[in-house]
Design a protein with these regions (language model features):
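Amphipathic alpha-helical segments used for helix-helix packing
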Residues: 87-122, 160
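Hydrophobic alpha-helical connector segments
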Residues: 55, 66-99, 134, 141, ...
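Amphipathic alpha-helical packing segments from all-alpha helical-bundle domains
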Residues: 64-68, 106-146
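Outer-membrane beta-barrel translocator/channel fold
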Residues: 150-157
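Short, Lys/Arg-enriched anionic-surface-contact patches
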Residues: 1-6
């Protein structure tokens, strides 16, 4: 198997392990076993488990930001909705394991591995809202993105327990996030007032 194909297979296996068993399961040994390679082979490709996790973070950031970018463009065109964007963001941190991976990397002292995620989000927002890059521009969508990501991260970590404790539906946070996104879209002029939330 060519080197790039082997790396790609390892990252996909790492993503599957992350979703199935959490970030602590994403080890060179486990990924090697999953793709029928040796530990030494993966060590050659990545150098360490931390570098494998960083490659996984890059992969997650690219795929999630790609999906969110597509959903945002669809919402602008009137064939998608802000709720789809919110669901993609929340699911990336919850079901896809993004929050668990981010927390694990930070607790392991591998904070630098989060840079690809942060940078991918920044690039996406700059691409979708270039007007906010101008000097003295209002950063409506940048600020909304920060809030949306932090809501999604927090919900993935303690959302279910907190909702139960407060006696509210867990879905409430997604509804509030959608309302915030719609308000910001209207303020930024990227959505018609009559469009579907």
């Amino acid at each position: 198997m060519p080197q790039e194909e082997s790396r790609r297979a390892a990252v996909e296996a790492a993503r599957t392990l992350l979703i199935e068993a959490g970030p602590q399961a994403v080890t060179l040994k486990a990924v090697a076993a999953r793709i029928g390679r040796t530990h030494a082979n993966l060590l050659h490709h990545f150098g360490s488990a931390a570098e494998l996790q960083k490659a996984l973070a890059v992969h997650l950031a690219a795929t999630v930001c790609g999906s969110i970018g597509d959903a945002a463009r669809a919402a602008r065109a009137g064939i998608g909705s802000p709720r789809e964007i919110v669901d993609l963001a929340f699911d990336a941190f919850d079901r896809e394991g993004g929050a668990a991976l981010a927390t694990w990397m930070m607790l392991s002292g591998n904070e630098g591995a989060l840079d690809p995620i942060v940078e991918a989000i920044h690039r996406l927002i700059d691409e979708l809202h270039p007007q906010e890059q101008e000097h003295d521009a209002k950063l409506t969508m940048h600020e909304t993105t920060q809030a949306l990501v932090l809501l999604a991260l927090g919900d993935a970590l303690i959302g279910e327990r907190l909702a139960k404790s407060l006696g509210v539906r867990r879905e409430t946070v997604r509804e509030r996030a959608t309302a915030m996104l719609v308000t910001s879209y209207l303020e930024a002029g990227v959505m018609n007032p009559g469009a579907e939330p």
